[in-house]
Amino acid sequence: MDSKHVTESTSGQEDIQKTWWKEAIIYQIYPRSFQDSDGDGIGDLNGITSRLDYIQSLGVDIIWLNPIFLSPNDDNGYDISDYREIMREFGTMEDFDRLLKEIHKREMRLVLDLVVNHTSDEHPWFEEARKSRHNPYYNYYHWWPAEKGEPPLRLSYFDEEG
């Protein structure tokens, strides 16, 4: 099956473009362990930016970043508490903007690991939802009823106690 498609350019000539999401070389980065730029032992956005030439030299088309959003880090960054903030140890929104600009300068793309199927228990939606069954955020979550007189069952693949 041919994974290329043809588009017509503004000049009227046909352009053949790669179907980027099918044919691209994707380089996944777990920011925490990739490259530390400030000596604190934690990888960060500026560290990733500093290695873009190397990544590009590998023939990479897309960089896929694991979660970088604000998180209490109980679930390796997948427990996001604010989708509008960068995890402080990774840098700032300005660092992210610079990283994105530098990626685009090298004609690469960026894919973010956007975790929308669950949040941190510290996320404002969850904090509101747990207040009442009538709260507007209550149905954002799936709630499991507790046995009478028992705490709710809490399942976690990462927590040995729960």
Indicate residue ranges for each PLM-predicted region:
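Acidic/aromatic-lined carbohydrate-recognition and catalytic surfaces
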Residues: D2-G162
